[in-house]
Amino acid sequence: MSSGDGAPETAADDNDRRLRVLELYSGIGGMHFACPPDKTRVVAAVDVNTTANATYAFNFPETRLLQRNVQSLTARELDALRPDVLTMSPPCQPFTRQGLQLDSQDPRSASFLSLLRVLPTLKHPPTYILLENVKGFETSSTCDAFLDVLRDGGYHAHRYLLTPTQFGVPNSRLRFYCLAKLNPLRFSDCPTACDAQCNQEPPPNVTKCDRPRKLYDFLEQTEENSCSDYLLPDRVLSRFAYILDIADATSTNTCCFTKGYGHYVEGTGSVLLQASRDLMHEVYRHVQPRTAVQDNVLESLRTLRLRYFTPVEVARLMCFPDDFRFPPELKARHRYQLLGNSVNVCVVGSLIRHLLDDVGN
């Protein structure tokens, strides 16, 4: 891991004709996994989170990784990297429904606003830009400032509100995406400049799926006892049984997994039923809203063997490849936190390929 300039590029790097990607707010590398290797190579990644960077370096040991706040990046440093593609997923907390929605007044917006001041001064601006954030970002003053920078810089931008279920993945994770190309490049499906609204359907040339796959395909096929560490404890069953979002192996959807999954209960993600649905319906006849369950009902709830999805399963639902790994010393709670802050690799990968549809043609 590097906190400075990293290793110098070699002659072989100079001969590599693939597009150069700069990954800002790189997290655990979701954007990197999403970039098509035949068209792109990530020349640098930047993030301030040490735990995320340890995971990134564990999966991409050869990539130049800068342990820095994006706010510290200068125009000179960005120009030296010569990125053709800029990907970024800025902090979402200023725009979430659960937060205070302080928008640009939130200190966590400072690094992105600083970047917006630097971008217009670049001598070598990126040709392609992809940004991901939560629903709510699209109505913020921060987004308005971002779109102003794109327009003034000669970019053509398309905006989307998309969820993985539209791509066949059984997980709801509605996110805002902005794709931008520098003039004179245009989007093949719509050659106009910045759209006036967010599209809620994927681009026409992106493969959609009307029926998501079943959860079974994403579960760890292990002995049931091996997941005993993930069973919901009695304190959760007794207090929160009524508000749980419960899925089973045949389900075609799960709720969005957040960084609080496994620690908090309400609104952080679905849990998995390891018994029959008939048994679940019978047991839940005795579960009352907003009331702690009686001992006999708690005993019945235990028979459902409700458990959290494992970090491996959450990673699969986020479409990380099977060879994605966390450092072995990282605890489950931290793995959930990192996944909750990451991007869906399938959705981003489809959009990047759409963004780069004019490359290599």
Model-derived features: positions:
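Core alpha/beta nucleotide-donor-binding catalytic domains of modification enzymes
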Residues: 2-126, 135-141
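Intrinsically disordered, low-complexity regulatory regions enriched in Ser/Pro/Gly/Thr
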Residues: 14-17, 57, 170, 248-250, ...
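Amphipathic alpha-helical segments that form well-ordered structural scaffolds
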Residues: 34, 55, 114, 145, ...
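Class I S-adenosyl-L-methionine
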Residues: 73-83, 95-264, 270-280
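A structural signal for well-ordered alpha-helical segments within the folded catalytic domains
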Residues: 29, 50, 113, 141-144, ...
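C-terminal target-recognition/interaction regions appended to catalytic cores
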Residues: 225-361
